[in-house]
């Protein structure tokens, strides 16, 4: 753990639009027996309820969603471009079917009951505050539905307090 140092949200150097949308992130959560992770490129950072927060959206079919739903904390972690292949792999296979973490080549770490990977350059440890499933009748721009939800598998939105930011 000595590679990471804790910073305040105001000290974050990365651009969240690039970090999340272009470089991707891993959403990682654990239960008593297992850790699961998935690659995500949708989400955001901000302030809500006077707290620094992250928001992510997870589809009901994603195995990681079960871990996020059943736990109090999860992490968002970000990587240098050298890890893009590993992130692509982690986003394309399910932890239900194989030990994808072992096959990814990434090194699992745990801090404060939150799991993430040693290879990350930035880690947000997040505590869930709120969740809300998307509902079809709440879409103002209904053209999004056929493009992003042809199977009606609407995301669930999670808002989480960022309790710690770790950087290398």
Predicted feature descriptions by range:
Residues 1-40, 44-168:
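Active-site-proximal mixed secondary-structure blocks
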